[in-house]
């Protein structure tokens, strides 16, 4: 029998299919399956392209399944699939493009590039900073992702979707392409692409079938990976919300501590190297003294970026959480614009637009200027950034959270955005807690303050008003039963004569008058201004208001009703005698005099600093100008009472303007604001000298409300300090009253606060009063009256008064210095004599001639 050839055996088996199947199952099936399952690699020759038998293809499939079972890394599994596909499709190269959404825009980025049958994973894995990114409207892969259909490009030169920029970048020529989307349900997850069919002009229909068949493995791998990733993200998000929620409800009082506790607690779940939180200033409206320089043209208006609700973007604090290397937290109050977390401009941009920004390659970013060098000694550099706004329930941006460098080196993806956004959104909503607490605390403080006011102050009652409006004695009825003409007749007989009492003079002294007489003088000023009839002020309300004001001032050493009246009297004198009334309307004059009378009502005899140190409810209620705002609120509280409201017959516009003028006037008495406004006032005075006629200047002044407000604010300061301008016999007494009140505060600081007071408030340094007075006159007071005397020469008597008083205080200060110098010289003489006597005593140690004095602690026998 001759030798049987392979062709004959193959022909026999093809003709006897049943026999071939029985023979294979009996002899080889168990061994093949056993060998296949036990093998570490498929027994297929990949060294050159060739057609595969069904057994070899089965081995490839089993190899892919085993790899999928044993390998948890999605990139490696997909890489193995692509290597096999390269061989099966006889493609020169394959690449994988991952679908993602960045800043709301879909795109494709290379994850595995230039995979071939002999490739190594590490060479094909694309680093985040080396990605090639395709938008969906560009290239064949973009078209595939957009259409969600397989694409077989026979000739790239004739295809409208082909883009050659990758060929130009890699110096490679793409002739034909076979690409298909990898789907998860209806969503595109990635696009896989094979290029350049080997030994054939293009990919065939058979290649499309092979690709789709083996793509099931890629689909399965990506789906499992995607579901695993989603599960991980949702788990992290749940943990973040759970832990941040626990810390949010632990801290209900302060937004900064609330954010800090929540963000620090969830740091392990954020999957980044570093993150920072910038807190925004929530101030929407500036104080008038900050607006004046802009309105006066002395400072340019703010032209920088603003939040969507119109606030100036000002990060008042940045909290930096460092998670790489040694963990650390840095809190930067009032960070400079060049701080590393702000210098790029990204947080400002996010605060301005309210958008989430995902920067995947920070060093290559053109729009934002990130630092390209290491930030610290550890060599840490910014690679990718995710920044988003923190928005409260009112849709106001309260801060910006920025996360740097995902830990696995990849850029932040859509799920990271969702996770971080959940945290930022939760923190934004949680701001409602400290806001509500602050509102409740504010109401509680108001309640405490008003309870204290009610205990101490009582408005003018029906018995007290009879001391001035003697309606029972004259008409036998109550004031509210009388006509206005009847009340006017009574007041005409009761109120003092303005000329006789000199209430319009700068040298007026309250010392000879009783407090009731001062109330009557105050009422008379309203008649002198001719505002009672013009604005239909009820005369009963006027009397009750002035009497209540006198009771509203506490019985303290200096800041009592007498001081309040003196400030009102000086305001009246400046308007009438100083001729400043020409710049103001009658309504404004009414508001200014009323504000002057109210300016220190319910003063406690201690200053603003003491309120803060003692943690007085006032300090918690008012952030700045603490006492001044309290005086203002107290005065407005009296005016809200119908029986005391002298503004009750003003129309709405007049009432709002009068209250506005009072707001500015009373707050302007805070000396802390004095140095802000005096330069502006000086420029107004200088400008007044450039006008030829008084009428032209007056018309110019009345055109601009801001100029009038600045003058009024400086008038309030001049009124508040006016005691320093009184005749010496009056001023010297008042100065002692001021000093006595200061010393009382110093005593409180010693006993209550356990602190040493400043020299001005130290009773033990009372002898230095003349020197302190001279310093106060030079540093604070002289400027006011010198400028007012330049502004209006009618006010010169006030400057003369302060000049004379300075001479008196200077003489006393010099006398004190002379006495102290004499005492010091006498003391030195006594010490010298005592040392000389000690040197002559037996056992003493006299110093040699011209030598040092003998030691006080050592004696040689």
Swiss-Prot record:
Binding site residues for a divalent metal cation 2: 600
Residues annotated with Cysteine methyl ester modification: 858
Cofactor(s) it depends on: a divalent metal cation
InterPro entries attached to this UniProt entry: GAF, GAF-like_dom_sf, HD/PDEase_dom, PDEase, PDEase_catalytic_dom, PDEase_catalytic_dom_sf, PDEase_CS
Domain PDEase: 483-816
CDD domains listed in its UniProt record: HDc
Segments for region (Disordered): 821-861
Note accompanying the cofactor annotation: Binds 2 divalent metal cations per subunit. Site 1 may preferentially bind zinc ions, while site 2 has a preference for magnesium and/or manganese ions.
Lipidated sites in chain (S-farnesyl cysteine): 858
Membrane topology summary: Lipid-anchor
GO MF, one annotated term: 3',5'-cyclic-GMP phosphodiesterase activity
Keyword Cell membrane included in the entry's annotation: yes
E.C. number(s) listed in UniProt: 3.1.4.35
Sequence ranges of Low complexity compositional bias: 830-861
Name the UniProt record assigns to this protein: Rod cGMP-specific 3',5'-cyclic phosphodiesterase subunit alpha
Organism: Canis lupus familiaris
Lineage, opening ranks: Eukaryota, Metazoa, Chordata, Craniata, Vertebrata
